[in-house]
C-alpha cells in the first residue's frame, strides 16, 4: 500500500507550520492512521533527545507525541544549531557531524540531502502517511539553489504541498500571492491549496478576500483556522512571552535572563504557565529585578552568554540575590556558568580559551567533543525524594568539590549536578526537570512557595493537542483534503 504524504510550507517563519503539522498528525492518529511527522532540515537551539540516542528539533518531538510515537532521528534528519551569527553545528541523524559557516554548508547540502532521503525512505516504508513540515519560506530566492528544506525536497520526492499564512500579522493575501508568484511552474502546480492561520473576528468579513484569492491564484482555500488562546505547546524558536490567562495571586516571583544563545527555553514553560508563579524573561537592557528565584537556562554558547550576563549586570545581581537569601537554579549551560571556570580548549562553542564563571559553585567545566545525549529519570535530592524525568544534551564535563551533594539521583545510581552547602543553589544538567509534577512542586517548595497546587504539564500538553486537533478538524475542508490524506 503506497504511503500518503503532504507537506506544509509557510509564507514566513512562525506562520503556523509546526502547529498545523501537529494538528494533522493528531487528527490522523485519532482516525486510526499510522502517521509520522517529518522535517527534512530544521534550524533551532531547542532540541529533544530521541529513543535512538540522537537529537531532533522540539517541534518534531511534539509532532511525534501527537502521533503517539516516541521521538526518532528520522523525523528530523538534519538539525542546524547556530553557535554564532555565522556558524552552526550540523547534526545528521541525531549526531554532530561538523561545524560549518553558511557558505560551507551550502556546499555540504548534497550530503545532507542524502541523509534526508535515507530517513524519508524508511518512514514511507513504515507508515501509512507522513506529514512534512517545511522551513521558513519556499520563496527565499537566495536559498533556492540546492534547497533541501522546502520545494527542493518536495520536488525530489514528489510530495504535494499546502501553504499556511498567519493573518494575525497582517498582509495575508500579499504573503500568499507573493509566495506563489515566486515559485517555478512545477512548484506552483505542486501547491494544492492555502490555509489561513490565527483568524479572529467575523469570518463573513473575510469571505470576499477568500473568493478573490481563489480566483487570483486558482488554488482553493482549505481552511481558516481560529486564533487559539492558551495552548501549552512547545515553542521552538522565539521565547514565549505572551501573558498567560487564569493566573491566581502569585506566591513566588521568578525571573530568568534571555541571553542571546539561550537553548531549550521551554524548560521554563512550567514556571511561566504555573497559575501561582509570577514568571518573567528579562531581556537585554532590562535591569535584573528582585525575585524569589532566579533561573539560568541552557545556552548553546556558554562563554559568550556568560560575557553577556556580566555586561547586563547579572553577575552582581545574582550575588546580591544570594546574599539576601534568594534561591538560584542553573540548568545545563546555566549550571556550567555557576562554576569557577569554563574551559573550551577545542573551540567547540567559539574561540578556544577559558572564561571565569560566576563562582557560585566550587566546580569547573571543560567542554569536550563527545556530546552527552540521553533520556533520564530518577529523584531529586530534596525532601521526599520527588520523582523526575528529563534528558541530557551537553558537551561539558563538570568536576570539583562543589559536587559533594548531587541535585539529582538518576535511575542508574549516578548523581548529577549539585546543591550548594547553604541550600540556596540547585544545579543540574537535566533538561525538562520542571516538567514532572512532583519535581516541579518540590522545587517550588524549595524556592519558598508553600502549599502550591500540583500541576501536570504533560497531561496539559496532551489535552491541548486534542483541543488544537478539534479546532483544526472543524475548520479544514476535508472534502478537498480527501485526495491528499488517508482516513
Curated annotation (Swiss-Prot):
Pfam families on file: CbiA, GATase_3
GO biological process, one term: cobalamin biosynthetic process
Keyword Methyltransferase: no
Chain ranges of the GATase cobBQ-type domain: 251-439
Active site: 332 (nucleophile), 431
An MF annotation (GO) of this entry: ABC-type vitamin B12 transporter activity
Pathway stated in the Swiss-Prot or TrEMBL entry: Cofactor biosynthesis; adenosylcobalamin biosynthesis
Xref: InterPro entries: Class_I_gatase-like, CobQ/CobB/MinD/ParA_Nub-bd_dom, CobQ_GATase1, CobQ_N, CobQ_synth, GATase_3, P-loop_NTPase
Domain of life: Bacteria
UniProt entry keywords in alphabetical sequence: Cobalamin biosynthesis, Glutamine amidotransferase
NCBIfam families: cobQ, PRK00784.1
Alphabetical list of PANTHER family matching this protein: COBYRIC ACID SYNTHASE (PTHR21343:SF1), DETHIOBIOTIN SYNTHETASE (PTHR21343)
Protein family per UniProt: Belongs to the CobB/CobQ family. CobQ subfamily.
Function, as annotated: Catalyzes amidations at positions B, D, E, and G on adenosylcobyrinic A,C-diamide. NH(2) groups are provided by glutamine, and one molecule of ATP is hydrogenolyzed for each amidation.
Protein name (database record): Cobyric acid synthase
Origin species: Dechloromonas aromatica (strain RCB)
Amino acid at each position: 500500500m503506497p504511503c500518503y504524504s503532504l507537506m506544509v510550507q509557510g509564507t514566513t517563519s512562525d506562520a503556523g507550520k509546526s502547529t498545523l503539522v501537529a494538528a494533522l498528525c493528531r487528527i490522523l492518529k485519532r482516525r486510526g492512521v499510522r502517521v509520522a511527522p517529518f522535517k527534512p532540515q530544521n534550524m533551532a537551539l531547542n532540541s529533544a533527545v530521541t529513543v535512538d540516542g540522537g537529537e531532533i528539533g522540539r517541534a518534531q518531538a511534539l509532532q511525534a507525541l501527537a502521533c503517539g510515537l516516541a521521538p526518532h532521528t528520522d523525523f528530523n534528519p538534519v538539525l542546524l544549531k547556530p553557535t554564532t551569527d555565522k556558524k552552526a553545528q550540523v547534526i545528521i541523524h541525531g549526531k554532530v557531524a561538523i561545524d560549518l559557516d553558511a557558505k560551507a554548508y551550502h556546499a555540504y547540502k548534497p550530503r545532507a540531502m542524502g541523509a534526508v532521503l535515507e530517513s524519508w525512505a524508511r518512514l514511507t516504508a513504515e507508515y501509512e502517511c507522513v506529514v512534512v513540515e517545511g522551513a521558513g519560506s519556499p520563496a527565499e530566492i537566495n536559498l533556492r539553489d540546492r534547497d533541501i528544506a522546502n520545494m527542493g525536497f518536495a520536488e525530489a520526492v514528489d510530495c504535494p504541498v499546502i501553504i499556511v499564512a498567519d493573518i494575525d500579522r497582517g498582509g495575508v493575501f500579499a504573503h500568499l500571492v507573493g509566495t506563489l508568484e515566486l515559485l517555478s511552474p512545477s512548484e506552483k502546480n505542486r501547491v494544492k491549496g492555502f490555509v489561513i492561520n490565527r483568524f479572529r473576528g467575523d469570518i463573513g468579513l473575510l469571505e470576499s478576500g477568500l473568493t478573490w484569492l481563489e480566483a487570483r491564484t486558482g488554488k482553493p482555500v482549505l481552511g481558516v483556522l481560529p486564533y487559539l488562546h492558551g495552548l501549552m505547546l512547545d515553542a521552538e524558536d522565539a521565547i514565549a512571552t505572551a501573558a498567560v490567562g487564569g493566573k491566581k495571586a502569585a506566591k513566588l516571583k521568578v525571573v530568568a535572563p534571555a541571553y542571546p544563545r539561550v537553548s531549550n527555553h521551554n524548560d521554563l514553560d512550567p514556571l511561566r504557565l504555573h497559575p501561582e508563579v509570577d514568571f518573567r524573561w528579562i531581556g537585554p537592557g532590562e535591569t535584573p529585578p528582585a525575585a524569589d528565584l532566579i533561573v539560568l537556562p541552557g545556552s548553546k554558547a556558554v562563554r559568550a552568554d556568560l560575557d553577556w550576563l556580566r555586561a547586563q549586570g547579572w553577575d552582581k545581581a545574582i550575588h546580591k540575590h544570594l546574599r539576601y537569601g534568594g534561591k538560584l537554579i542553573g540548568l545545563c549551560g546555566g549550571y556550567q556558568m555557576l562554576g569557577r571556570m569554563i574551559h573550551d580548549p577545542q573551540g567547540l562553542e567559539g574561540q578556544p580559551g577559558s572564561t571565569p564563571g560566576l563562582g557560585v559553585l566550587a566546580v569547573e567545566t571543560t567542554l569536550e567533543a563527545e556530546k552527552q545525549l540521553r533520556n533520564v529519570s530518577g529523584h531529586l535530592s530534596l525532601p521526599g525524594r520527588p520523582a523526575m524525568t528529563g534528558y541530557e544534551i551537553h558537551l561539558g564535563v563538570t568536576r570539583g568539590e562543589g559536587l559533594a551533594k548531587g541535585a539529582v539521583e538518576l535511575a542508574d545510581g549516578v548523581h548529577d549536578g549539585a546543591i550548594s552547602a547553604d541550600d540556596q543553589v540547585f544545579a543540574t544538567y537535566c533538561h525538562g526537570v520542571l516538567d514532572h509534577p512532583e519535581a516541579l512542586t518540590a522545587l517550588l517548595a524549595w524556592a519558598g512557595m508553600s502549599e502550591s497546587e500540583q500541576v501536570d504539564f504533560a497531561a496539559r500538553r496532551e489535552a491541548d493537542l486534542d483541543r488544537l486537533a478539534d479546532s483544526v478538524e472543524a475548520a479544514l475542508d476535508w472534502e478537498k483534503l480527501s485526495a491528499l490524506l488517508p482516513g
